[in-house]
Regions:
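Juxtamembrane intracellular "pre-TM" segments in multi-pass secondary transporters
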Residues: 1-7, 191-222
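Extracytoplasmic
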Residues: 12-44, 235-240
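Residue-level signature of mid-helix packing/kink "hotspots" within the transmembrane helices
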Residues: 29, 58-66, 150-151
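Extracellular/periplasmic helix-loop-helix junction of adjacent transmembrane segments
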Residues: 35-63
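Helix-breaking motifs and short loop linkers at transmembrane-helix boundaries and internal kinks
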Residues: 44, 76, 97-103, 114, ...
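Conserved MFS/SLC helix-loop-helix module at the cytosolic interface between two early adjacent transmembrane helices
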Residues: 62-102
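Helix-loop-helix hairpin linking two adjacent transmembrane segments in secondary transporters
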Residues: 103, 130-133, 140-188, 192
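Cytoplasmic helix-loop-helix junction between adjacent transmembrane helices
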Residues: 107-148
Length: 242
């Protein structure tokens, strides 16, 4: 009989969750200094088109956010994270070896779709393990660590560009993805037991969206959040050129 893994300590859990959540931020913010170099390397005629390197990640992430919650409820938290990390890493490889801008954007879409798993499933992991005020405290600690990544990522990307080209930034993020996946596999036990899982159907996603949109409070918050997030994406995509 296979012995269950022991729960990891709070401090290690905080840093593991923060690392997994930071994959999206790294794949976006670390690439900002490299947009001009990417455009030149891939013969992008209009400099404004390089902004799609950023927006493609958000587009892919939008689709993934709808899928990984129900998947993790059916197949377990860790399996869903493995799937997302795998897609994320494949997207990075496509971007690294892309010879034209279309392949670059395809890779970026996959990176966004894959990294969405960490944004969704890490929250489910936290809810599985903690509740009440302790859950709020852990979320605060994880976000406090995570929030440092978007602030540091552009400097990391620029530092890499001083010694290598834009592909080295992708290799750096790829290495962190591998490290995060191995850390998750070795140290973090599965938090959703088999008896608490439910069958996956696309009707679950549809009914969830329908229920959210029917609720006026949820609908209002979603619209407001969308407007704010849209402005943020617009700024982030054009920040490097500005």
């Amino acid at each position: 009989m296979k012995q269950a893994k022991k729960e990891i300590g709070h401090r290690e859990f905080v840093f593991l969750m923060a690392l997994l959540m930071s994959m999206t931020a790294l794949s976006i913010d670390a690439m900002l200094p490299a947009l001009g170099q990417i455009g030149q390397s891939l013969n992008v005629q209009n400099p404004n088109d390089t902004q799609m390197v950023i927006s493609a990640v958000f587009l892919g992430m939008a689709g993934g956010l709808l899928l990984y919650g129900p998947l993790s409820d059916s197949y377990g938290r860790k399996n869903s994270l493995y799937l997302g990390i795998g897609i994320f890493l494949v997207g990075i490889i496509i971007s690294i070896y892309s010879t034209n801008f279309s392949f670059m954007l395809m890779g970026r879409l996959l990176q966004g779709f894959g990294s969405a798993s960490a944004r969704v499933v890490t929250v489910a992991l936290i809810r599985d393990r903690f509740e009440g005020s302790e859950m709020g405290r852990m979320m605060s600690l994880i976000l406090a660590v995570f929030i440092m990544v978007p602030a540091m990522a552009p400097s990391i990307g620029q530092g890499i560009l001083y010694v290598a080209d834009w592909r080295a930034i992708f290799w750096f993020i790829f290495a962190l993805g591998i490290f995060g996946g191995l850390w998750l596999n070795i140290r973090q036990p599965e938090t959703l037991t088999a008896e608490n899982r439910r069958s996956f159907t696309f009707s679950i996603i549809y009914s969830g969206i329908k229920e959210t949109l029917k609720n006026p409070i949820s609908r209002t918050y979603a619209i407001i959040s969308g407007i704010i997030f849209g402005a943020f994406i617009g700024y982030l995509s054009s920040a490097q050129q500005i």
